[in-house]
Amino acid sequence: LKSQITYFLYYLGLVFLGFLFFYAFPSIALLSFVLVSIYHFGEQHWESNSFNTNLYKGKKIFPIILHGSTFFLVIFINNIDVVNDVLASFNTIFLDYSVLETLLIILFSIYMLMLLSFKLFRRYFIGEFLFFLLLYFLTMNSTLIYGFSVYFIFFHSILSIKDQVSYIYEDDKSQYIKKYLINALPYLLLALFFLVGFYFFVDIESINILPIIFTFLAAITSVSYTHLTLP
């Protein structure tokens, strides 16, 4: 119990430092958040496939970066006004739709060509193409929070839990998943407690909630790899 409390306080401390960095240096923090997130989401996606064990580190970086970059470009393009509103709240630069659109076409084309060109990647082509097609239509017809939440829950968090279970217990059998969820339950309940409190005691309609959520995600993502030190 003592080690869990120590780890929890350590993690909260890192998140708090992330908040301070984000508000002290918003432009640098935003860029760092996007770069870290591109790698994080791309790595998480490809870690769910067994392909990475057959590649040396220098080669497997390409699908990771291309997947993560394409993901964020799709999110930003289909929510450009909301994203720029968030950026405006931090007094930083705006994103240009035409530039993002051109960049998306180029990177997505390179990504698809890479998957088709290498035999090891070829079997992932259809899955990746359909994934981004669905993501595009999802984010085009929904709000930024809703679209990102659907992706985060079904395409990121579940895979992340599986990877963490495998890392901690060196296996992802149901008994270890159950053990992991039991150990994580106090943190889940604490998060729900603060979420309910925030909902009932904060006038959401009177404040711009997106910058707060964005900053929180940035702080969490910036220290996301610390979960690998969980005993």
Provide a role label for each language-model segment.
Residues 1-7, 115-125:
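Short, amphipathic, aromatic/basic-enriched membrane-interface segments that mark the entry/exit
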Residues 10-19, 111, 129-137:
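Hydrophobic, membrane-inserted alpha-helices
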Residues 17-67, 71:
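Membrane-interface helix-loop-helix junctions at boundaries between adjacent transmembrane segments
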Residues 34-46, 154-163, 220-223:
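Alpha-helical transmembrane segments and their membrane-interface exit regions
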Residues 51-116:
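Long hydrophobic alpha-helical segments that form multi-pass transmembrane helix bundles
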Residues 123-160:
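Membrane-water interface signatures at transmembrane helix termini and the short loops
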Residues 199-214:
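Extracellular/periplasmic helix-loop-helix junctions in multi-pass membrane proteins
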Residues 226-231:
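Conserved small/polar residues in nucleotide/adenosyl-binding loops
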